Amino acid sequence: MKKNQFLKESDVTAESVFFMKRRQVLKALGISAAALSLPHAAHADLLSWFKGNDRPPAPAGKPLEFSKPAAWQNNLPLTPADKVSGYNNFYEFGLDKADPAANAGSLKTDPWTLKISGEVAKPLTLDHDDLTRRFPLEERIYRMRCVEAWSMVVPWIGFPLHKLLALAEPTSNAKYVAFETIYAPEQMPGQQDRFIGGGLKYPYVEGLRLDEAMHPLTLMTVGVYGKALPPQNGAPVRLIVPWKYGFKGIKSIVSIKLTSERPPTTWNLAAPDEYGFYANVNPHVDHPRWSQATERFIGSGGILDVQRQPTLLFNGYADQVASLYRGLDLRENF
């Protein structure tokens, strides 16, 4: 695998900063403006994060043992870990970016069960300890591009999904991989209350083609910044597919099912004209309500430091993944 030379020092992002462009979709689902919070409050919250970290630190995760393969390392300075764990998209805990850090402490991540089933010869069940001990862990510094036109760089820790799927031995009928988040409304307020959770249908579900899932870049992620994932980042295990928009990165996974048919996905169900199944980062295919040609690389400085730069096809991973889509119309299959 080639080293990711496209990363520059300016690419390293202040993980704290997100933009809330999907609020209009949530309104279309019947969520009132009041329930989505007042604009002034949202703006004040965003600006408070640009000014600096004045929030309580996220609970410290357990330190992990992992390697640092040269292909996924660089000399870039990373932004403080408390910001990536303090400003998140995880609607099961609320719509505002600070809600997951405030509310996700209710999620019990140990014990945990992850089942691999469907079109496999050997169904598997992993427990909490298996997630960090069954496979060698490695740190990978990946770019992440949100569909909302911001981007960041994160040192995720995990293992390639293909190693897990190989143990289950996919059958010849397996064409897709379906993922499902835990359904625990007593722990996740957004699953109880549609005003908190944006009116989405829960549990959150996602999917990949089998060849996408088996690609070496696709990572089952159990840690970040050297430690186990905190709940607000998708503990104890989440998916990272770095050439796709961030909503493909399903969190707190309890089920992986191999299927012969394309599985449903949450945002595609909510707004099929806006969020496709593939969700490949593509500067030539705009969102219906904003351009995807450029993105905000948001650093650790103040709000005036935020600048736009061109979005890279497949988020800069075209050399590795473009062959997966040879002959596919990327405008039709967005």
Curated annotation (Swiss-Prot):
Cellular component GO terms held in the UniProt record: periplasmic space
Signal peptide start and end residues: 1-44
Q: Which cofactor does it need?
A: Mo-molybdopterin
* Protein keywords: Metal-binding, Molybdenum, Oxidoreductase, Periplasm, Signal
- EC no. given is 1.8.5.-
Q: What is its main location?
A: periplasm
Q: What is this enzyme's catalytic activity, as reactions?
A: L-methionyl-[protein] + a quinone + H2O = L-methionyl-(S)-S-oxide-[protein] + a quinol; L-methionyl-[protein] + a quinone + H2O = L-methionyl-(R)-S-oxide-[protein] + a quinol
Per its UniProt entry, which superkingdom is the organism in? Bacteria
Q: What's one GO BP annotation on this UniProt entry?
A: protein repair
Q: Which residues bind Mo-molybdopterin?
A: N88, Y91, E92, C146, T181, N233, R238, G249, I250, K251
A Pfam family that this protein carries is Oxidored_molyb
User: Which NCBIfam families is this protein grouped with?
Assistant: PRK05363.1
| Name of the featured protein | Protein-methionine-sulfoxide reductase catalytic subunit MsrP
Q: Print the organism lineage.
A: Bacteria, Pseudomonadati, Pseudomonadota, Gammaproteobacteria, Enterobacterales
